[in-house]
Amino acid sequence: RFKKIRRLGALPGLTSKRPRSGSDLKNQLRSGKRSQYRIRLEEKQKLRFHYGLTERQLLKYVHIAGKAKGSTGRVLLQLLEMRLDNILFRLGMASTIPGARQLVNHRHILVNGHIVDILSYRSKPRDIITTKDNQRSKALIQNYLAWSPHEELPNHLTMDPFQYKGLVNQIIDSKWIGLKINELLVVEYYSRQT
């Protein structure tokens, strides 16, 4: 993980650690001139590692985004941001996306009153995300909520920390994306691969 954040910069979904300021200078001095291919590859890797996707999963999302109306890059980011594991991370119910994945895999999360154990579940507006009604599930979420830095919630989400309940209000707006990335470079990377 630390090699990845040193090479690619801060990835809040992967870890809360940040690269040291001195390591950035060393990377720039060592790397020399960066080719266009390398720049596109690094942007793609940033996206992949932040959301914890395999190459194949990311390629599938790029194809879905390409078929949808609108800007492919913007639709791609919306698809990734509306995944259940990412929604839990953005609500503060988990400190990282891998932590959110564990909550989903161990069946601690309910969506609209039903247990969902599919990480890639695509959240929709008016989805209500809660924990199971047992002590262990609530203790896990309470622990994450107590220790997570209280950042401003994106406007497409609402959180009630006392009832351990989150609400998806709408599809995410592009200015609330949690990662500094040029999505057009990712789309370019994949368009040149085919």
Swiss-Prot record:
Full protein name: Small ribosomal subunit protein uS4c
Keyword Chloroplast applies: yes
Alphabetized GO MF terms: rRNA binding; structural constituent of ribosome
NCBIfam families, alphabetized: PRK05327.1, rpsD_bact
Domain S4 RNA-binding: 82-143
Entry-linked PANTHER family: 30S 40S RIBOSOMAL PROTEIN, SMALL RIBOSOMAL SUBUNIT PROTEIN US4M
Main location: plastid
Family annotation (InterPro entries): Ribosomal_uS4 (IPR022801), Ribosomal_uS4_bac-type (IPR005709), Ribosomal_uS4_CS (IPR018079), Ribosomal_uS4_N (IPR001912), S4_RNA-bd (IPR002942), S4_RNA-bd_sf (IPR036986)
Biological role: One of the primary rRNA binding proteins, it binds directly to 16S rRNA where it nucleates assembly of the body of the 30S subunit. With S5 and S12 plays an important role in translational accuracy.
Gene Ontology CC annotations of this record: chloroplast; small ribosomal subunit
Subunit structure: Part of the 30S ribosomal subunit. Contacts protein S5. The interaction surface between S4 and S5 is involved in control of translational fidelity.
Pfam family, one: S4
Gene Ontology process terms (BP): ribosomal small subunit biogenesis; translation
PROSITE patterns assigned to the protein according to its UniProt record, in alphabetical order: RIBOSOMAL_S4, S4
Family: Belongs to the universal ribosomal protein uS4 family.
Alphabetically ordered keywords of this record: Chloroplast, Plastid, Ribonucleoprotein, Ribosomal protein, RNA-binding, rRNA-binding
Subcellular location: Plastid, Chloroplast
